[in-house]
């Protein structure tokens, strides 16, 4: 059977459900697909279909994630839901499932729980731009005042992690009622209200092609009579022949001009996000550029060597370390296309890090790398992945 063509008529956004175990993330995911399938077409997915998430590998780490898609009148969504807490941690840190926004699910009867807090912190650290809250299982709360208290508590918690707790939308309902097709006033109607809030409140992401040009350099060739060609996959933006570009990272930043772009041995006027290309650089010799640097629009990205990161350290079972590590740990940090050695400093009060932990840590690299917040990396020892991280704050 021929694959259905993906009709890109509506803006697209990636979202996910986050929150404490058993607060109803997967039931809500099922409810959204069912209600929207009826409202605007698409395929309804049952709880069991979503819950038996397949495993995937991202940056050498195995993660179970369920992907569903659905659409509202205004947008098309790709939605991720993870079965276990560890999968969320890994997913958010590796960026395996990029989230433009998330729905935080809180059981109205319990209020915020430890993982609620942890997922909000992770969302803050990895740069999820916007959250919308669904207070679930409202049929288990008899007292209207109790609901208001839980809502206040959730808003305060969000504010304490620098989300706009007072302003972000909170919808209260029952995902199970929606799945079972009963009590529309707390079921289906609330799911539609939630998705209207998501449509309005979660910003449409800027498409990669509209962002400033960036291409990680994978390889460097010298072509006699023509000069130096660097190859790689354009991560974002567009590069046109004749444009000035910068080579950033590892060494001092230099400027050059793109004198040619080729793909599959054909010459192009420009390369754009997603293309695997060779870029011909004017006046740069073979030794003047290396793997690990990036080509970028001038002024759009700068090299840094000190940063704060949120990291997940693999367990022994996942192929990670068997022993803890301490301050002054010196692994390799794999950014985009290359390994760079760095020194880890742990926060005060953190004596050591055990396999399976997720932590905040300070890193100082031996050479600077083109860096910005939200940049993902792998932590490696001798070529084997022992962790994953994301830059949460640049120091210098």
Swiss-Prot record:
Extract the ranges annotated as region (G2): 60-64
Q: What HAMAP family does this protein's entry cite?
A: EF_Tu_B
A UniProt-annotated Pfam family: GTP_EFTU
Region G4, as annotated, extends over: 136-139
Q: Where is the tr-type G domain?
A: 10-206
**Species name:** Maricaulis maris (strain MCS10)
Return the protein name.
Elongation factor Tu
Catalysed transformations (reactions): GTP + H2O = GDP + phosphate + H(+)
Instruction: Write down the InterPro entries for this protein, in alphabetical order.
Output: EF-Tu_GTP-bd, EF-Tu_GTPase, EFTu-like_2, EFTU_2, G_TR_CS, P-loop_NTPase, Small_GTP-bd, T_Tr_GTP-bd_dom
Provide the assembly information.
Monomer.
Q: Please state the gene responsible for encoding this protein.
A: tuf1
Record key words, sorted: Cytoplasm, Elongation factor, GTP-binding, Hydrolase, Magnesium, Metal-binding, Nucleotide-binding, Protein biosynthesis
Single GO term (MF): GTP binding
Concerning PANTHER family, the annotation shows: ELONGATION FACTOR TU, MITOCHONDRIAL (PTHR43721:SF22), ELONGATION FACTOR TU-RELATED (PTHR43721)
Function recorded in the entry:
GTP hydrolase that promotes the GTP-dependent binding of aminoacyl-tRNA to the A-site of ribosomes during protein biosynthesis.
Quote the Gene3D superfamilies the UniProt record gives: P-loop containing nucleotide triphosphate hydrolases, Translation factors
């Amino acid at each position: 059977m021929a694959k259905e063509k993906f009709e890109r008529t509506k803006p697209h956004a990636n979202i996910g459900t986050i929150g404490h175990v058993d607060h109803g993330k997967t039931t809500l995911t099922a409810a959204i697909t069912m209600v929207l399938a009826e409202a605007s077409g698409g395929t309804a997915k049952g709880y069991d279909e979503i819950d038996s998430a397949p495993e995937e590998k991202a940056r050498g780490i195995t993660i179970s994630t369920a992907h569903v898609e659905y659409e509202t009148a205004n947008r098309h969504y790709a939605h991720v839901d993870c079965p276990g807490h560890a999968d969320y941690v890994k997913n958010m840190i590796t960026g395996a499932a990029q989230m433009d926004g998330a729905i935080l699910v809180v059981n109205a009867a319990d209020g915020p729980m430890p993982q609620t807090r942890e997922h909000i912190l992770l969302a803050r650290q990895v740069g999820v731009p916007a959250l919308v809250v669904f207070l679930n299982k409202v049929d288990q709360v008899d007292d209207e005042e109790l609901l208001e208290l839980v809502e206040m508590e959730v808003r305060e918690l969000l504010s304490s992690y620098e989300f706009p707790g007072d302003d972000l939308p909170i919808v209260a309902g029952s995902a199970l009622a929606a799945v079972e097709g009963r009590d529309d006033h707390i079921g289906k109607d609330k799911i539609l209200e939630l998705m209207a809030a998501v449509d309005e409140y979660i910003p449409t992401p800027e498409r990669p092609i509209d962002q400033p040009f960036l291409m990680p350099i994978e390889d460097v060739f010298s072509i006699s009579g023509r000069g130096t060609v660097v190859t790689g996959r354009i991560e974002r933006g567009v590069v046109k022949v004749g444009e000035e570009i910068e080579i950033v990272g590892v060494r001092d930043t230099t400027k050059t001009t793109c004198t040619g772009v080729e793909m599959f041995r054909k010459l192009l006027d420009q390369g754009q996000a997603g293309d695997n290309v060779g870029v011909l650089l004017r006046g740069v010799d073979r030794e003047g550029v290396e793997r690990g640097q990036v080509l970028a629009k001038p002024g759009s990205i700068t090299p840094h060597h000190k940063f704060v990161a949120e990291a997940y350290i693999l367990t022994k079972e996942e192929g990670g370390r068997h022993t803890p590590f301490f301050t002054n740990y010196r692994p390799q940090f794999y950014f985009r296309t290359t390994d760079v050695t760095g020194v880890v400093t742990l926060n005060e009060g953190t004596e050591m890090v055990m396999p399976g932990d997720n932590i905040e840590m300070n890193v100082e690299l031996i050479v600077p790398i083109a860096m910005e917040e939200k940049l993902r990396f792998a932590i490696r020892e001798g070529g084997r992945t022992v962790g994953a991280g994301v830059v949460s704050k640049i120091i210098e």
